[in-house]
Regions:
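Short beta-strand/loop motif that positions the catalytic acidic residue
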Residues: 6-8
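Conserved alpha/beta-hydrolase "acid-adjacent" motif
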Residues: 14-19
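Conserved alpha-helix/loop element of class I SAM-dependent methyltransferases that forms part
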Residues: 88-104
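Class I SAM-dependent methyltransferase "Motif I" SAM/SAH-binding loop
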Residues: 111-113
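Class I SAM-dependent methyltransferase SAM/SAH-binding core
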Residues: 116, 120-157
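A short SAM/SAH-binding and catalytic strip from SAM-dependent methyltransferases
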Residues: 168-179
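S-adenosyl-L-methionine-dependent methyltransferase catalytic module, highlighting the catalytic core
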Residues: 182-190, 194-288
Length: 289
C-alpha cells in the first residue's frame, strides 16, 4: 500500500498541527502507513512556501529514500557490526527484542530514535511498525529508512491510540527519561498486548562502589555527561521495577511479567545469579492478562 507523509507547520492557522495529527491518527487506525512531522515556523499558512532545510530533506528522503547523511548510520539491512564498547551497549537490547517479536506482528517503538530497530524488524520479519519520537531530526531519519513515524510526545501518541492496536510496544532504554514512567508503562499495556521494557540497572555493583568510594554519580559510555548537562533521569533498579509491577498488579492492573533477560556490566554476557547486584542491563516482557 502507498505511504503517506503529513507535514504540519507550527504557525499554520488554516491547517493546524492538531488537525494534521487527526488526519494521521485516522489513517493509522485504518492500517495505513502514515507519518507525521511538525516544522517550527512563524509564517502562518504560507510557511510551506518559505521552506527550510528540515522540510526540504524530509520531502526528498520520503520520495528518494536514504540520503548521504543517513547512509552514515545505515545498518546495511541488519544490526551493524559493532566494535566499540559504546556501540555494543547501544544495541544490546535490540537482539533480545528481535528474538521476542514474531513475523508479521504490529510493533510500536516509543522513543524510536533513527528507526534502526523497526527497519531491521520490517526487513527480517515483515512487521507492521510505527515509531514515536519527539526529535524532528531523528523522525526524518526514520522517513529516510522507510519507517513510519509520529513526531510527537509519547504520552500524546499513546493517548490517541486504540486499545490492543499493537502486538508489541517497545521501550528501548528510554523509560527513565519520562516523567511519571509508571503511568506511561500502564498506558502502553492498554495499547499493546505485550510490552518490552529495557533499562539500565542502577543498583549494579560498580555503580554502588563508585558512589560509595567517590561520592559521585557514574560517568561512562552510557552516561557521558555530568549531571548539570544531562536530561531528565529517573534512575531505578531491577528490584524497584519488579516492585512497581507487583504494586500495579495489586492495584488492579491485569498484567504479568513474562520473559526476563539480564546482561552483566559488559552488556554481552548473561547474568542469572543476583541480577539486582550483578546485572548492568535488564530487559523485561510484560504480558497483558
Amino acid at each position: 500500500s502507498s505511504k503517506v507523509l503529513v507535514i504540519a507547520f507550527s504557525s499554520d492557522w488554516l491547517y493546524t498541527p492538531s488537525e494534521n495529527q487527526w488526519v494521521v491518527e485516522s489513517l493509522q487506525r485504518l492500517g495505513k502507513e502514515a507519518s507525521y512531522l511538525e516544522m517550527p515556523d512563524t509564517h502562518g499558512h504560507d510557511s510551506f512556501l518559505k521552506g527550510s532545510d528540515d522540510f526540504d530533506r524530509a520531502v526528498r528522503v520520503f520520495f528518494s529514500g536514504m540520503d548521504k547523511k543517513e547512509e552514515e548510520e545505515q545498518n546495511l539491512g541488519r544490526f551493524r557490526q559493532v566494535s566499540s564498547r559504546y556501540e555494543v551497549k547501544k544495541e544490546a537490547d535490540f537482539k533480545v527484542i528481535d528474538d521476542w517479536v514474531s513475523s508479521g506482528q504490529r510493533v510500536l517503538d516509543l522513543g524510536c530514535g533513527r528507526g534502526m530497530l523497526l527497519e531491521y524488524l520490517r526487513d527480517s520479519k515483515q512487521v507492521q511498525g510505527l515509531g514515536v519520537d519527539f526529535d524532528r531530526s531523528k523522525a526524518i531519519s526514520c522517513i529516510a529508512r522507510g519507517v513510519s513515524v509520529y513526531q510527537q510526545d509519547i504520552r500524546h501518541a499513546l493517548a490517541n491510540l486504540p486499545d490492543d492496536s499493537f502486538d508489541w510496544v517497545i521501550f528501548s532504554r528510554m523509560v527513565e527519561e519520562l516523567p511519571e514512567p509508571g503511568a506511561v508503562i500502564l498506558e502502553a499495556l492498554r495499547v499493546g498486548r505485550r510490552v518490552a521494557v529495557s533499562f539500565v540497572n542502577h543498583a549494579y555493583w560498580r555503580n554502588r562502589l563508585n558512589f560509595l568510594g567517590r561520592g559521585k554519580r557514574v560517568q561512562n559510555e552510557v552516561y557521558p555527561d555530568r549531571w548539570e548537562k544531562s536530561g531528565l533521569r529517573n534512575h531505578f533498579s531491577i528490584e524497584e521495577f519488579e516492585q512497581f509491577c507487583a504494586d500495579s498488579q495489586v492495584d488492579g492492573n491485569a498484567f504479568a511479567i513474562g520473559r526476563k533477560v539480564f546482561h552483566q556490566g559488559d552488556w554481552v554476557k548473561h547474568c542469572s545469579f543476583m541480577p539486582n547486584l550483578r546485572a548492568g542491563l535488564a530487559i523485561y516482557e510484560l504480558i497483558k492478562d
